[in-house]
């Protein structure tokens, strides 16, 4: 069985408060895009994990795909399998690739073992793997709050836009990004209101709070965002806590010059 776990971007990100448990409350919009990993599982005599594509610097046991397998194996009689994950979604780029892999793994295992898990059951298991993992079960635009784990579906159609995605060799861990974040207590417009403005009104309104702290540390990320605007982007932003940057362009978009980015669509 094979699946294509897709990435997501954040449209805006407000850090609302620092929590007593060390986490932060946030507000953001998750939106799925068509940049995908490839995940395949087949029955085998012994469980084995094979990874290709973008290198992953973690133990196999720490990979979210393996954690998804072990989680369901505690509750169901799963077969031994060979897992092949080809990573195309950059790691530490704010695109949710690992979370997507884990959620799609739950889908595949449910189908392979005829578990017939409902959407709600899949979401409950995904929640145990990561705060944003349940998003990839329904894979539709949502307003996310809490620690990025409380979702409200929203109507958002961006299919008439191309998304230009720029990834870098900079790896920004989520914990690193939150270390220096300054929580703003200034009243501001809700993301759920801003998102319904015309896209050409988003610039300087739809803000990612991490940019203020990340850009001085990694000025090349700021330069990428500006270059996307120079190329004619209607809106550009860093995704999540970085380091990827995206720009929205009206279709059909044809890149100017030699600026290096990939073109994607919204799902």
Swiss-Prot record:
<feature type="active site">
    <location>
        <position position="8"/>
    </location>
</feature>
<comment type="function">
    <text>Catalyzes the phosphorylation of the position 2 hydroxy group of 4-diphosphocytidyl-2C-methyl-D-erythritol.</text>
</comment>
<feature type="active site">
    <location>
        <position position="132"/>
    </location>
</feature>
<dbReference type="GO" id="GO:0005524">
    <property type="term" value="F:ATP binding"/>
</dbReference>
<keyword id="KW-0808">Transferase</keyword>
<dbReference type="InterPro" id="IPR006204">
    <property type="entry name" value="GHMP_kinase_N_dom"/>
</dbReference>
<feature type="binding site">
    <location>
        <begin position="90"/>
        <end position="100"/>
    </location>
    <ligand>
        <name>ATP</name>
    </ligand>
</feature>
<dbReference type="Pfam" id="PF00288">
    <property type="entry name" value="GHMP_kinases_N"/>
</dbReference>
<keyword id="KW-0547">Nucleotide-binding</keyword>
<comment type="similarity">
    <text>Belongs to the GHMP kinase family. IspE subfamily.</text>
</comment>
<keyword id="KW-0067">ATP-binding</keyword>
<dbReference type="Pfam" id="PF08544">
    <property type="entry name" value="GHMP_kinases_C"/>
</dbReference>
<dbReference type="GO" id="GO:0016114">
    <property type="term" value="P:terpenoid biosynthetic process"/>
</dbReference>
<dbReference type="InterPro" id="IPR020568">
    <property type="entry name" value="Ribosomal_Su5_D2-typ_SF"/>
</dbReference>
<dbReference type="InterPro" id="IPR014721">
    <property type="entry name" value="Ribsml_uS5_D2-typ_fold_subgr"/>
</dbReference>
<keyword id="KW-0414">Isoprene biosynthesis</keyword>
<dbReference type="GO" id="GO:0019288">
    <property type="term" value="P:isopentenyl diphosphate biosynthetic process, methylerythritol 4-phosphate pathway"/>
</dbReference>
<keyword id="KW-0418">Kinase</keyword>
<dbReference type="InterPro" id="IPR013750">
    <property type="entry name" value="GHMP_kinase_C_dom"/>
</dbReference>
<dbReference type="GO" id="GO:0050515">
    <property type="term" value="F:4-(cytidine 5'-diphospho)-2-C-methyl-D-erythritol kinase activity"/>
</dbReference>
<protein>
    <recommendedName>
        <fullName>4-diphosphocytidyl-2-C-methyl-D-erythritol kinase</fullName>
        <ecNumber>2.7.1.148</ecNumber>
    </recommendedName>
</protein>
<dbReference type="InterPro" id="IPR036554">
    <property type="entry name" value="GHMP_kinase_C_sf"/>
</dbReference>
<comment type="pathway">
    <text>Isoprenoid biosynthesis; isopentenyl diphosphate biosynthesis via DXP pathway; isopentenyl diphosphate from 1-deoxy-D-xylulose 5-phosphate: step 3/6.</text>
</comment>
<dbReference type="InterPro" id="IPR004424">
    <property type="entry name" value="IspE"/>
</dbReference>
